[in-house]
UniProtKB/Swiss-Prot annotation:
Entries under NCBIfam families matching the protein: reco
Protein name per UniProt: Uncharacterized protein RP548
Pfam family, one: RecO_N
Superkingdom of the organism of origin: Bacteria
GO biological process, one term: DNA recombination
Length: 115
């Protein structure tokens, strides 16, 4: 099963030394989690929270966590770091998305409003 969509990186949690689990809020498919491997220091900045990415998710079955690959579209990291109020607002929105939305439920209207 393959899914390709535009999304916002919501969280990144370590799994092993260079392996992480990322959570992405996609435009047409909702929240998806996937395993990524940071192979070099060059692609570390891609997986920062708040970045808009071209998200590719592959798994054998729909229920599996899957392997994720991301291509950076736009980075908002510097935009949030400059202003504390924007950083707090962003963190609040991220927390709400994680708590209120279920995995793999489409929320394209909210995605459009948040961008």
């Amino acid at each position: 099963m393959n899914i390709k969509d535009i999304g916002v990186i919501i969280s990144k949690k370590p799994l092993k030394e260079n392996t992480f689990i990322i959570r992405v809020f996609t435009k047409n498919h909702g929240l998806y989690s996937g395993v990524i491997k940071e192979s070099s220091k060059k692609n570390k900045f891609i997986y920062q929270e708040g970045n808009i990415v071209d998200f590719l998710w592959k798994a054998r079955l729909h229920e599996h966590i899957g392997i994720a690959k991301c291509e950076l579209i736009k980075s908002y990291t510097g935009y949030f770091i400059i202003n504390k109020a924007k950083l707090y607002a962003f963190n609040s929105v991220i927390s709400l998305i994680q708590e209120l939305f279920h995995e793999r439920e489409e929320h394209s209207i909210f995605f459009f409003i948040s961008n």
